[in-house]
Amino acid sequence: MNAHATPIHDPTALHAWVVALAHELGFALVGVTAPAESSRAAALRAWLDAGKHGEMTWMAETVEERCDPRRLLPSVASIICVADRYHDGSRDCEQIAQEPSEARGRIARYARSKDYHNLVRDRIHKLRHAMQKRFPDASFRLTGDIQPLMERDVHQAAFNGQIGKNTLMLVPGEGSWFVLGELHTSLVITPSTRPPAWNRDDPCGSCTRCIDACSTGAITPFSVDASKCIAYLTIEQRGTIGPEFFGAMNGWIFGCDDCQTVCPHCQPKKRRAVDERMGSVAARYEERLNSVPLLELLGWSEEDRARLIMSSALKRATLAMMKRNAVVLLAEHAAKHAATCEAIEARLRSLQLDSTEDEVVREQCAIAIAWLASQRA
């Protein structure tokens, strides 16, 4: 990595140096902003008060830190925001499974490669190391989506993107297929400026495709009820999935991309590709696993889980959660394909009666069996 030899003290020159370093490290987007309380702090508190965070109690416990990044690093003067493109927007080939053994659960695209947390964090560490070497007295702190920070707000302030109606950060004309990371520093760096191509504050206009595509009704303009979101239900919720969501999971076993795949900005043929870095997907995000066989998953051991998914973001879901999700999807499959219903229901009954199985999985089987009976009534 070329760290450039000239010492830098001017905030504007430092901005150019940091952006060059980050691009050398392969980041598609780089922006800088000054720390400030989030403009959506009141909206976040109202969202929490309404219980739309579901079981994610840690969000309420860290609300003050989330709303003001200065609480994460008191000496912070600048936040460097970086992002990677992890998908080009192309659609998956639809495969219609008729037999239970063919039924598979889809994985959200960000979780199909190696764990993006590591892919982003490792290079932010390199960025920090280069900056610390040049400025040994400066303070730094890395953040990502596991720290209490409204990071999409911060990236919007750094002009990396704009927040869409589905609450994801999207780049106008390029979409929302980006994973984010940040480096907070005590160094004063000139903030980024608004790109000339951004000719509106609202990137969505009258479009409601993401809202219309959400099968659980989780999305309203610029807000998502996490307790109804498929991504939350399959990844964050620890208990059973209620029968009100059966028939709406759309084959997703981990996460959901439905609100992105319909977004006009996310379509590969419509992307502007103004910047090659922004438009291309690095080899580090090569897909390794895009779906899993549902019946086979019900027989997984902890060793199977570790072997197949522990190097990816899939590890966020426990084995019991993955099995729970598979139970729901198998019930949906049985409801659509009557010829498979008897075999799937027999497997679910067997799992429900297995005293060695996790209680949540057994309870989910009972819910699924009752739901299938209601579909026949």
Where are these regions (language model features)?
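Iron-sulfur cluster-binding cysteine motifs and their immediate structural context
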Residues: F27, R209-A231, R238, W252-M278, ...
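Short, hydrophobic/aromatic alpha-helical segments in well-folded domains
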Residues: L127, N199-P203, S215, A248-M249, ...
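Auxiliary alpha/beta "docking" domains used to position bulky ligands
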Residues: M1-D202, I241
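Accessory, usually C-terminal, subdomains that scaffold auxiliary metal cofactors
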Residues: P203-G205, R209, F222-T240, G247, ...
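Alpha-helical scaffold domains
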Residues: P243-A377
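Short gly/pro-enriched beta-turn/loop segments at secondary-structure junctions
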Residues: I163-G164, P172-G173, F178, C207-T208, ...
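Flavin-dependent oxidoreductase catalytic cores
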Residues: R194-P195, N199-R209, I219-P221, K315
